[in-house]
Design a protein with these regions (language model features):
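Conserved active-site alpha-helix within GNAT-family acetyltransferase domains
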Residues: 101-115, 144, 271-287
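Short, glycine/charge-rich beta-strand/loop segments that flank catalytic centers
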Residues: 91-108, 119-122
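Conserved donor-binding loop and adjoining core beta-sheet/short helix segment
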Residues: 28-100, 212-242
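Aromatic (often tryptophan-rich) hydrophobic motifs at membrane interfaces
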Residues: 206-296
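Acyltransferase donor/substrate-recognition loop-hinge adjacent to the catalytic core
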Residues: 110-184
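Short catalytic-loop micro-motif centered on adjacent basic/acidic residues
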Residues: 93-94, 158, 263-266
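Non-cleavable N-terminal signal-anchor transmembrane helices
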Residues: 1-55, 298-303
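Short, conserved active-site entrance elements at the starts or edges of catalytic domains
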Residues: 163, 167-216
Length: 303
């Protein structure tokens, strides 16, 4: 039986140790995300056979487990996940798998899981130098937006700190209010996550930056290190009616805060056509492929 518990700040050290043992951790394997997403779902963690196991229960009751992370006994940890999922008697799946992970699951449990590639959840991985320099013809539109911003606005950039976090939260709330999205529930949930992340900003080791126009915060971004080489951007907000704000905060943040990282992980697009177009327009070095698995019950139907 897996001894799950709610993630606490005291779990940070051992969880990060397990994450650092991975070849290339993706956004699911981030202590900041695990801790902050408890604002909108029931997340539990445990050490099982030397691996990190994460269990997420969504508001609709569906349960997903992260593939075991770390250098422990992955096969035994997987067996415990399967036992836990079946024992609960509710629909469940396993997510956050790379190709190697999916092959391990298939080798040991192919008879009870539908395993599939999940393009909507692939992380976009960029070279930090590309995001900083924006060289070449393909980045000309980005440079044009930035040039307009620099020439037409009285702007400043600064690091996010305890002093300006309240202004960032106020800006995020205003951004949501102005949003034209028909279904605002996902954005409202995101705001809950952002607020929790800011509440523990320093303790979680986040890095962030913001833009001001005439003293007013109009954009911010924040994230955390996944490894010595990879920084993961969790959130990025800018007012859409201010031309160049998104392009500017992206470039300023990478230039000022992320020069020591080789890669910048800007997470997935969740299947959003507009978000996918925006992420592809920055020409990722590669996509971190992901696979998901859904448990198939005894009558051969997906749960």
């Amino acid at each position: 039986m897996i001894d799950f518990h709610s993630p606490q700040l005291s779990d940070e050290k051992w969880i990060k140790e397990k994450i650092l043992q991975m070849k290339f951790p993706t956004c699911e394997y981030s202590f900041g995300n695990i801790f902050s997403y408890t604002a909108i779902m029931d997340i539990m963690v445990a050490e099982c056979f030397g691996c990190l196991v994460t269990k997420c229960t969504f508001r609709d009751g569906f349960v997903e487990y992260c593939f075991p992370a770390g250098n422990g006994d992955t096969v035994s940890a997987l067996a415990e996940i399967v036992t836990d999922g079946i024992r609960n008697g509710i629909p469940f799946g396993i997510f956050g798998m790379n190709k190697e992970n999916a092959e391990i699951l298939s080798r040991h449990h192919s008879d009870i899981f539908d395993i599939h590639y999940e393009r909507d959840m692939c992380d976009y991985i960029y070279l930090s130098e590309d995001l900083k320099n924006l060289k070449g013809k393909k980045y000309q539109p980005k440079r044009n937006h930035i040039s307009y911003f620099e020439k037409n606005f009285n702007w400043t950039y600064e690091k996010i700190s305890e002093d300006n976090i309240p202004e960032c939260i106020e800006m995020a709330e205003k951004w949501l209010e102005l949003s034209q999205h028909e279904d605002k529930e996902p954005l409202e949930q995101e705001l809950e996550i952002i607020c929790r992340a800011f509440k523990y900003y320093d303790r979680l080791g986040y890095k962030g930056g913001l833009l001001r126009l005439d003293g007013r915060v109009v954009a911010f971004t924040m994230g955390e290190s996944l490894s010595d080489d990879v920084f993961c951007v969790h959130f990025e907000k800018a007012y859409t009616d201010i031309r160049g704000a998104y392009q500017m905060i992206n470039r300023q943040f990478v230039t000022n805060e992320l020069s020591s990282y080789k890669y910048v992980n800007r997470e997935d697009d969740t299947g959003s056509e507009n978000l996918r177009k925006a992420k592809l327009s920055y020409y990722p070095a590669f996509l971190a492929d992901k696979y998901e698995a859904t448990y198939i019950n005894e009558d051969n139907t997906k749960c």
